[in-house]
């Protein structure tokens, strides 16, 4: 069956090129890094490791102040530069971590931070699929790591990728199972699948292709799932050696906050009660935007901040605000909220923690149709958390936080409006305070999960 997949990957090669071209046209690919989809460019031996993207107005600069490491800054026409390093020699061990998108990328950073304490000489390669994840990594990736886009899942490109990098250990996070890269990767090094989950939709699909699923999964030396429900799904698919340690997202560090920006923002907001709508999709905004005028009519000291999951949608969101008679400004237009507006749209990466810091209540997006996003990030900031009816990608976390009276689940727009009105009502101040305190307690109580993960991973480290 794996051979059949390999053959199909050859037959469909022209289709892959078309898909990549379409993704380029709609802005989902970075033309400056498109070669990485075909495993062209960086490699492990004698390579310049891409450590960080930054903006350098000086054009070209070489810093040889430190003997161990020399850095090269290359100014690109699009104002993006690659900070490259000769820090790592071929002899150093390389741990390859695949993180599909934003949520997994945050987990990968937690793993890097803690694995390097166990193995100080290890260096890291992070692969991901989305532009959004790459932009986040450009500001957060440590010097001991580099990022590359995962190549197309075709045997030619995957073999070239693995030949270039020669990883000593591979760690796949959550649910993205590319048959070719996993099958070929297992020929080069041990592979681990951590924080694994299977959505209900994927489970139904894999039940029809159980033997193929088993062929893919057998390449992993260890499988750690994130919930009892996921363990049962793996068992039903014929995988009996998976283990459940819980969701490693509990161990993700609190989002960083620039204290100078926070002081400035807090002073500017002047004690307004802030409601943040975080990681929103169009389906969320269809519910959120119609209720804002009603909410602000009753609570004049309430200020709305919306942080879309994909900031490139900002023009569309601004247009939708106009359609609902809402005054809105984007962060790219004004660095501080316009207090006379109805809504402020944050179309910048890396500032979620800043706005959670000033929030009283946070609604977590993707929870109407996308299965929900990470609700723990807001919990670290002691926000009262609200989410929609679809938390299928975070079932156990949603169940746990609800059981601890640390969040509220709503069904629709009317339910959301009534919940916000209730929480903002001065008579319910103690109730709101309890939700906020319980959210922080919930996330702090579960942080020991990381130690259990590291205990399992440690024997596999090079």
Swiss-Prot record:
Question: What kind of membrane protein is this, topologically?
Answer: Single-pass membrane protein
| Catalytic activity, EC | 2.4.99.12
Q: Name one GO cellular component term.
A: plasma membrane
In this chain, the site described as Transition state stabilizer is at: 174, 249
Its annotated compartments are: Cell inner membrane
Report the family membership: Belongs to the glycosyltransferase group 1 family.
Checking NCBIfam families in the record gives: PRK05749.1-5
What function is annotated for this protein?
Involved in lipopolysaccharide (LPS) biosynthesis. Catalyzes the transfer of 3-deoxy-D-manno-octulosonate (Kdo) residue(s) from CMP-Kdo to lipid IV(A), the tetraacyldisaccharide-1,4'-bisphosphate precursor of lipid A.
Name of the protein: 3-deoxy-D-manno-octulosonic acid transferase
User: What organism is listed for this UniProt entry?
Assistant: Rickettsia typhi (strain ATCC VR-144 / Wilmington)
Its gene name is waaA
């Amino acid at each position: 069956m794996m051979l059949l997949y390999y053959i199909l990957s050859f037959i469909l090669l022209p289709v892959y090129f078309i898909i990549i071209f379409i993704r380029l046209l709609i802005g989902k690919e970075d033309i400056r890094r498109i070669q990485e989809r075909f495993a062209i460019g960086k490699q492990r031996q004698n390579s310049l490791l891409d450590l960080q993207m930054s903006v350098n107005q000086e054009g070209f600069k070489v810093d040889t102040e430190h003997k161990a490491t020399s850095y090269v800054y290359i100014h690109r026409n699009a104002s993006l530069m690659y900070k490259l390093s000769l820090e790592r020699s071929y002899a150093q061990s390389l741990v390859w971590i695949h993180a599909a998108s934003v949520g997994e990328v945050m987990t990968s950073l937690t793993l890097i931070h803690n694995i390097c304490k166990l193995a100080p000489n290890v260096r890291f390669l992070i692969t991901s699929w989305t532009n959004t994840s790459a932009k986040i990594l450009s500001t957060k990736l440590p010097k001991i790591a580099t990022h590359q886009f995962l190549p197309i899942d075709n045997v030619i490109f995957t073999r070239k990728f693995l030949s270039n990098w020669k990883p000593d250990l591979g760690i796949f996070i959550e649910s993205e199972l590319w048959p070719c890269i996993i099958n070929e990767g297992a020929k080069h090094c041990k592979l681990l699948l951590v924080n694994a989950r299977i959505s209900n939709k994927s489970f139904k699909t894999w039940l029809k292709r159980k033997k193929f699923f088993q062929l893919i999964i057998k390449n992993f030396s260890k499988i750690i799932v994130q919930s009892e429900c996921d363990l049962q799904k793996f068992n039903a698919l014929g995988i009996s050696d998976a283990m459940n340690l819980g969701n490693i997202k509990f161990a993700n560090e609190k989002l960083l906050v620039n204290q100078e920006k926070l002081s400035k923002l807090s002073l500017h907001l002047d004690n307004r009660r802030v409601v943040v709508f975080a990681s929103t999709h169009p389906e969320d905004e269809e519910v959120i935007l119609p209720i804002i005028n009603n909410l602000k009519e009753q609570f004049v000291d309430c200020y709305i901040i919306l942080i879309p999951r994909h900031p490139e949608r900002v023009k569309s969101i601004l247009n939708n605000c106009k359609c609902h008679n809402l005054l809105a400004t984007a962060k790219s237009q004004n660095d501080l909220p316009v207090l006379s507006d109805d809504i402020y749209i944050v179309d910048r990466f890396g500032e979620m923690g800043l706005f959670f810091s000033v929030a009283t209540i946070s609604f977590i997006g993707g929870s109407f149709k996308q299965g929900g996003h990470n609700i723990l990030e807001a919990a670290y900031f002691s926000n009262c958390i609200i989410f929609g009816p679809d938390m299928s990608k975070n079932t156990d976390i949603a169940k746990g936080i609800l059981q601890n009276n640390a969040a509220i689940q709503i069904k629709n727009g009317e339910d959301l409006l009534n919940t916000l009105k209730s929480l903002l009502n001065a008579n319910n101040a103690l109730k709101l305070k309890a939700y906020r305190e319980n959210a922080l307690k919930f996330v702090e109580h579960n942080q020991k999960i990381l130690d259990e993960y590291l205990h399992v991973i440690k024997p596999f480290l090079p």
